[in-house]
Amino acid sequence: MSQEFLARILEQKAREVEQMKLEQIQPLRQTYRLAEFLKNHQDCLQVIAEVKKASPSLGDINLDVDIVQQAQTYEENGAVMISVLTDEVFFKGHLDYLREISSQVEIPTLNKDFIIDEKQIIRARNAGATVILLIVAALSEERLKELYDYATELGLEVLVETHNLAELEVAHRLGAEIIGVNNRNLTTFEVDLQTSVDLAPYFEEGRYYISESAIFTGQDAERLAPYFNGILVGTALMQAENVVQRIKELQIDKG
């Protein structure tokens, strides 16, 4: 995802937010806290499993998928959380997907989108999300803090996404409890698991780290397991002929 492409996405989000109605805040869906679960289950590399029909880099991935059935398969086979793409223009997602999945699973759901405004946070919570994504590269540090604080005040957890050391330091200054490392280079659009490995020496005690993107095989997961609490996997699961087998391959025993 080049900076130019990221800018295009953010311009689109700004237009969407401008048209978006401010929803009344609904009760928070009840499930376990992701950070607490990660704290108490550090003997295994946890899998955050994603429902994603398409992406800008790959185009269509799996347009015909039964999203609820896919999410329930994830849940039944030990996923710690379901990530749901809700961006319509670039990822062919929809807020209704989050709403439908959240109503049919008991584990946490993540609203995977480019969040730049409080209205989106309320909308995510009302659709059943218990975790939202905030991307350091998409926000000023001041705006990031405002949105982070607002989300936590609403009882949501936040996955703060980083890609390099400077962004990781921003997440640390923020006090983020759950931090993602995206293996996708925002300048070249290339992906490299080494991104996660290289940032690992800078991780801090008391925080939980998730590696995102470019994770396809058990070997990939084993490479990340010494450093991370979990991995976020989308394409590999959406393309898998045997989803159950694939998710089991990714759940690495760290004991």
From Swiss-Prot:
Catalytic reaction(s) noted: 1-(2-carboxyphenylamino)-1-deoxy-D-ribulose 5-phosphate + H(+) = (1S,2R)-1-C-(indol-3-yl)glycerol 3-phosphate + CO2 + H2O
Q: Which UniProt keywords apply?
A: Amino-acid biosynthesis, Aromatic amino acid biosynthesis, Decarboxylase, Lyase, Tryptophan biosynthesis
Report the Pfam families cross-referenced here. IGPS
Gene3D superfamilies recorded: Aldolase class I
Q: Which GO terms describe its biological process?
A: L-tryptophan biosynthetic process
Question: What are the EC numbers?
Answer: 4.1.1.48
Keyword Secreted on entry: no
| Coiled coil (residue ranges) | none
Keyword Lyase assigned: yes
Can you name one GO molecular function term for this protein? phosphoribosylanthranilate isomerase activity
Pathway, per record: Amino-acid biosynthesis; L-tryptophan biosynthesis; L-tryptophan from chorismate: step 4/5
Q: What family does the database annotate?
A: Belongs to the TrpC family.
Name of the molecule in the record: Indole-3-glycerol phosphate synthase
| Organism of derivation | Streptococcus pneumoniae serotype 2 (strain D39 / NCTC 7466)
Source lineage: Bacteria, Bacillati, Bacillota, Bacilli, Lactobacillales
